[in-house]
């Protein structure tokens, strides 16, 4: 009987209840709210769902995640394995044709990165270090894997808050962007009908990822793993002879890696890391970054329209953030409301895919400036 009592006491002592804190309770509530938003409201369910469940797991005391499969999942993020693999799948799903057909839209993708640097400046004004500010600023690029990649490099203690902000705002693009787009454009500008894009040859589509990889990687070697995998996936898509690799990259592989990446991100959301004033600042700075990025793209679109005599609809500039293809769809919806004959989707895909490259370049630039400081 005494042995039984000792065993019971041992179970009680080892249980998580004795180590359970108010912070754990709050974070489990946060996880439940995120699960509701993901599955009931369909806010980025493929990403917020696993992140939210990872948050629940991270706040179970004495969970033993220092070893075993959970440790390997966490290592996949800290060792920068998962983000490049996600980019491989993204590349296989991306059509760079609209960008190749209208190269000047690359400038719109670059202009939208103003949100990244505006948030960087704002974060430094709020007391964050340069490295932390850079990791926060990249939220404005609307690119979850790049946000996770840069946060892991520069501010791993902020990874959970940055990832949640990035993916939350990506899901809210249809709500955040239209008011900004309408604020900075006139009815006449929104009604502009753009000429149909030229047809892009297979040769151009094959050469583009090769040339882009060589040039950009030589310029910013620190993002070679991200950009290289993005372009490799695209090469699988466009070569015409690697259909199996392309199919695996854009389906089975990216789905599998997404589970591990998102769950591993959620595992960083322990109470001691997430419950702070900094988290609130990051959420607000993320919104500021999105608004500035959208405004920057639209304003540069207005400038292009002025220069080319009204051939460019400024609305496609908002697609310069790299939320693919959501931002391009928003441009299409807003343009169609202004002029039902308007079809901006393919035009907006140019700056949209340029934004993917632009965000990676912005991340590489900040890494080059800050990683050794």
Curated annotation (Swiss-Prot):
Q: How is its activity regulated?
A: Completely inhibited by avidin.
Highest taxon of the lineage: Bacteria
The UniProt keywords, alphabetically, are:
Cell membrane, Ion transport, Membrane, Sodium, Sodium transport, Translocase, Transmembrane, Transmembrane helix, Transport
How is the protein disposed in the membrane?
A: Multi-pass membrane protein
PTM comment for this protein? The N-terminus is blocked.
Q: What is its EC number?
A: 7.2.4.3
> How does this protein's activity depend on the pH of its environment?
Optimum pH is 6.4-7.0.
Gene Ontology biological-process entries = sodium ion transport
Q: What class of enzyme is it?
A: translocase
For this protein, the parts annotated as crossing the membrane are 17-37, 38-58, 81-101, 106-126, 132-152, 156-176, 206-226, 257-277, 280-300, 343-363
Q: Where in the cell is it found?
A: Cell membrane
A GO cellular component annotated for this chain's UniProt record is: plasma membrane
Q: Quote the subunit structure annotation.
A: The methylmalonyl-CoA decarboxylase is composed of five subunits: the carboxyltransferase alpha subunit (MmdA), the tunnel beta subunit (MmdB), the biotin-containing gamma subunit (MmdC), and the delta (MmdD) and epsilon (MmdE) subunits.
Family note: Belongs to the GcdB/MmdB/OadB family.
Q: What does this protein do?
A: Tunnel subunit of the sodium ion pump methylmalonyl-CoA decarboxylase, which converts the chemical energy of a decarboxylation reaction into an electrochemical gradient of Na(+) ions across the cytoplasmic membrane, thereby creating a sodium ion motive force that is used for ATP synthesis. The beta subunit catalyzes the decarboxylation of the carboxybiotin carrier protein and the coupled export of Na(+) ions. Can also convert malonyl-CoA into acetyl-CoA.
Any idea what this protein is called?
Methylmalonyl-CoA decarboxylase subunit beta
């Amino acid at each position: 009987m005494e042995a039984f009592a000792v065993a019971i006491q041992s179970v009680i002592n080892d249980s998580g209840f004795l180590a359970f804190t108010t912070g754990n309770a709050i974070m489990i509530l946060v996880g439940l709210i995120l699960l509701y938003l993901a599955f009931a409201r369909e806010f980025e369910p493929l990403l917020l769902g696993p992140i939210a469940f990872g948050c629940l797991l991270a706040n179970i005391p004495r969970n033993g995640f220092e070893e075993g499969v959970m440790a390997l999942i966490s290592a996949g993020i800290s060792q920068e394995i998962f983000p490049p693999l996600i980019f491989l799948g993204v590349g296989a799903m991306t059509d760079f044709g609209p960008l190749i057909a209208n190269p000047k839209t690359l400038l719109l993708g670059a202009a939208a990165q103003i949100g990244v640097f505006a948030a960087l400046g704002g974060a430094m004004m709020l007391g964050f270090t340069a490295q932390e500010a850079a990791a926060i600023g990249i939220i404005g690029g609307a690119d979850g894997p790049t946000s996770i990649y840069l946060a892991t490099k520069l501010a791993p203690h902020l990874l959970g808050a940055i990832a949640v902000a990035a993916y939350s705002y990506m899901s809210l693009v249809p709500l955040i962007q239209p008011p900004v787009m309408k604020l900075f454009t006139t009815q006449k500008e929104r009604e502009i009908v753009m000429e149909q894009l030229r047809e892009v040859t297979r040769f151009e589509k094959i050469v583009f990822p090769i040339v882009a990889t060589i040039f950009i990687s030589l310029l910013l070697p620190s993002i070679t793993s991200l950009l290289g995998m993005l372009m490799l996936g695209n090469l699988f898509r466009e070569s015409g002879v690697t259909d199996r690799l392309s199919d695996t990259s854009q389906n089975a592989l990216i789905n599998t890696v997404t589970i591990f990446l998102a769950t591993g991100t959620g595992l960083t959301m322990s109470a001691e890391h997430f419950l702070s004033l900094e988290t609130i600042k990051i959420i607000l700075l993320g919104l500021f970054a999105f608004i500035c990025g959208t405004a920057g793209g639209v304003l540069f679109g207005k400038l292009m329209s002025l220069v080319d005599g009204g051939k460019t609809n400024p609305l496609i500039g908002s697609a310069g953030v790299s939320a693919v293809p959501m931002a391009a769809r928003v441009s299409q919806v807003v343009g169609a409301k202004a002029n039902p004959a308007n079809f901006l989707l393919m035009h907006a895909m140019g700056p949209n895919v340029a934004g993917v490259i632009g965000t990676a370049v912005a991340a590489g630039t900040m890494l080059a400036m800050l990683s050794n400081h």
